[in-house]
């Protein structure tokens, strides 16, 4: 049951009674639990967002209601916990972050499942992934050792690998193993970059500036050229262009990332040399399916090789030809022996840096592409060779 004090706060906040406050009022508002971050607490019924002072709902520092509840629980702010639940926050998100018995008991009184910490953790993780609740997830997991320790070590990494392999998470990490805290932060940060969730990215870049270079690397690898453009031109975050291109090429089918590095000035021939050297290309040859041998190369780095040549990389340099022979790859040799089939694509020759124009150009390239798909092309060439 909510006290008169909580109901009074609800009315005062919803009517924006503190929108015009004097500096002398700050201490009183803080003592009454009516202060949030850097100003009087505010709430938007339509957006279900908790704000501070003159902040708008779209501000990077505004809080989704469930996330605000988690913060209030961590800080043991009893009246705010009751208030946020009254507005519709899910109290189960709160109980898993309760640090004291008193706060945990309050969450149970407000309807939380006492067993949620034992039986609901995995379902919650999946829910947060499906709903793309990045900031809520970080509010729950980051610096919450009790939750991280409740995961079995093997299961924890299975959950991380369920969405991503961990290659990109360790890009700039010198130590072989990260703490769970750092790993879970990077996991959700990477998730935001992958799905182009602008508000979480901006919030996290503001809160964790030491990860700026890693953010740029991740955006390149995932082909989020909006974020590459923002980091490179608006924040002046820099990385050697050929290193950027290497990261772009490391992900099969990353046309956007590869093109953007090319447009910035990366060396295409150098990129092609690195691609041909990737061990994964040697996975191209055979796979047994129902007793028949089928070529299995669509998922390899050949698509990136194909695209680099479309951009203008020269596959017929002496160094590249020697690398191909060293690889002893029949398909690669056949592909590179057909000079009329592999050549620059006219649509890709202009260097464009505006992300919206790049998306249009790559879409046009895909629609006008006249080459065979790699699997069909390889089969055709092998048949011709025989």
From Swiss-Prot:
Q: Which cysteines are joined by disulfide bonds?
A: none
So which domain of life are we looking at?
Answer: Viruses
- Biological processes annotated in GO: taxis
What protein family does this chain belong to?
Belongs to the asfivirus MGF 360 family.
Entry function = Plays a role in virus cell tropism, and may be required for efficient virus replication in macrophages.
Protein name as catalogued: Protein MGF 360-4L
Protein's organism: African swine fever virus (isolate Tick/Malawi/Lil 20-1/1983)
Q: What is the lineage of its organism?
A: Viruses, Varidnaviria, Bamfordvirae, Nucleocytoviricota, Pokkesviricetes
